[in-house]
Amino acid sequence: MERRLAAILAADMVGFSRQMQDDEVRTPSNLRHIQSTIIDPEIAVWRGRIFKTTGDGFLVEFASPMDALEGAIAIQKAAAAHNENKDSGEQAVFRMGLNIGDIMLDGDDVFGDGVNIAAHLEPLASPGGILVADTVQDQLWNKTDAAFESLGPQNLKNMDAPIVAYLVRAEPVRPGLVSWHPRTCPPLRRTLRRSAGDLIRI
C-alpha cells in the first residue's frame, strides 16, 4: 500500500436530487455535459486526477495545493458562466472542500484523513463556495491572489480534533455573474452564511 501527501478536493452538486425528481431524463444528461465541458477540462489543466465519483459529486487528487485551489476556483467560475441564462434544472452549483494531508492508495482506491477532512468540509460550504482546511491556508496565504477568511475551529465528523476552516474569496471571472444564497442551515452553517454571501463573487 502506497502512502503520500496530496491535496484533495471534494465537490458536490447542489440540488441534484431535486433536479432528478423534476426531470430524471434531462438531469443525468446535463451532468454529463457539465462533466465533459467544465469539470474534466479544468481538472486536466490543473493536473488533477478524479479518483472517485458519487453520481452528483467527485473527489480529486492534486500533487500541488496551488493547483488544487486554482482548479477549484476555475471550476466554480466556469460553472457560474455556464449558469447564465439557464433555468434551475440546467444550472451547475457546487460546494467544495479542500485539504492537504496524508492519503493511502490501495489500487485505484484513495483514503485516509487527507480525504476525510476534505469530504467533511464540503457540506459546510455555501452553494458556489469553497472551504479549505488550515493546512491549505498555511501553504498558500502569501502565494495566491485569493483571500482566506477564517471561520474558526470546526468539529468535523470522525475527527479527533477541530479543524480550522477558511472561506476562499477570489475575483470574479467578469462582472454580472449570478450570486447564490446558502440554504437554511444549522448554527454552524449560519456562521458560513453570514460571511459567504459574495464568495468568489459569482
Could you tell me what each predicted segment is?
Residues M1-I73, K77-A78, A196, I202:
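Catalytic NTP-binding/metal-coordinating core of nucleotidyl cyclase/transferase enzymes
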Residues A6, G48, Q91-R95, I163, ...:
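Structural motif
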Residues L59-R169:
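Catalytic beta-strand-to-alpha-helix segment of the class III nucleotidyl cyclase homology domain
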Residues M1-E2, K52, S88-E90, L188-T191:
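Short, flexible hinge/linker loops that cap or flank conserved catalytic cores
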Residues R183-I202:
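Acidic, proline/glycine-rich low-complexity intrinsically disordered segments
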Residues A10, G97, L131, A196-G197:
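Structured core elements
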Residues R169-R189:
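Juxtacatalytic C-terminal regulatory tail of Ser/Thr protein kinases
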